[in-house]
């Protein structure tokens, strides 16, 4: 019975992928191959989905023995710390403490089977998320932390981290939390408070919530990915998504700082501290030779 169920799930996954590709191709068959560009320039582009999208995932093999990643001339690579469960983001505190958010996408059912078929499951973890933050401290600066312990646990897919005004902020997928914090603490003991609710229902593949303080510390910027690949689940599911939001440190006065950003997973300040940079993962599976516009 178990084998029959697995076979059925595999077949369903394959058919779903094929049907999705054909549906998108049919929906876009009447769209023009030529689009208008600034200054009335004409740019020849293929129609969306004119070619089948192909993916090839990497296989994680880790380090063995004395092996190390190859570095450019003049650089070396060494292991700082290990034994993490999906270390997804790094935050370095003003005092030099290093915080690691351990979290990952959680998949189950047909989606999990599709990941196994495509090879995606071998390139990234997809089981239960660790949902914790680990602290590392290298007090003597020898490149090896003397302290490595769980700093905060029981979270919900944490990603962004920030220390501001005696608080430790965490960007969980469903909200911005803050905890009382004193410099040098190695564990959060106080009770936190959720100061901003963030959308996380339905399609939530873009679950990371990066945090960034304004240079003067008066604002906190929060990146929130879209609730879809390209709006296929309806615009009601995109409310407050595909944005960089900005709030006061107490979570009040929320505004949209930037919008139309499919998945702004990384945000930081340019060297001038006046321009916000965002690294955005744009839409997938359009086919060859097309810009990935969202």
Model-predicted regions and their roles:
Residues 2-8:
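Sec-dependent signal peptide recognition
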Residues 25-294:
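Beta-propeller domains with acidic blade repeats across secreted/periplasmic ectodomains
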């Amino acid at each position: 019975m178990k084998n029959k169920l697995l076979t059925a799930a595999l077949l369903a996954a394959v058919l779903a992928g094929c049907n999705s590709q054909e549906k998108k191709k049919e929906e876009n068959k009447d769209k023009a191959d030529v689009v208008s560009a600034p200054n009335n320039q004409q740019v020849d582009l293929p129609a969306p989905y004119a070619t089948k999208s192909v993916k090839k995932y990497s296989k994680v093999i880790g380090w063995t023995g004395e092996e190390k990643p190859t570095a450019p001339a003049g650089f070396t690579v060494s292991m700082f710390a290990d034994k993490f469960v999906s270390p997804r983001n790094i935050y370095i505190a003003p005092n030099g403490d290093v915080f690691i958010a351990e979290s990952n996408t959680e998949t189950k059912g047909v989606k999990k089977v599709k990941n196994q078929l495509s090879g995606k499951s071998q390139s990234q973890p997809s089981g239960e998320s660790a949902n914790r933050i680990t602290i590392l401290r290298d007090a003597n600066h020898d490149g090896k932390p003397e302290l490595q312990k769980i700093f905060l646990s029981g979270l919900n897919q944490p990603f962004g981290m920030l220390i501001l005004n005696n608080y430790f902020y965490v960007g969980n997928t469903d909200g911005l939390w803050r905890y009382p914090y004193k410099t040098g603490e190695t564990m959060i003991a106080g009770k936190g408070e959720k100061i901003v609710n963030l959308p996380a229902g339905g399609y939530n593949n873009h679950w990371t919530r990066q945090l960034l303080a304004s240079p003067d510390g008066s604002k906190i910027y929060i990146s929130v990915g879209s609730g879809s690949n390209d709006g296929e689940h309806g615009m009601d599911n995109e409310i407050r998504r595909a944005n960089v939001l900005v709030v006061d440190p107490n979570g009040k006065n929320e505004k949209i700082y930037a919008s139309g950003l499919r998945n702004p997973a990384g945000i930081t300040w340019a060297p001038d501290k006046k321009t916000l940079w965002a690294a955005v993962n744009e839409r997938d599976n359009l086919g060859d030779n097309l810009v990935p516009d969202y």
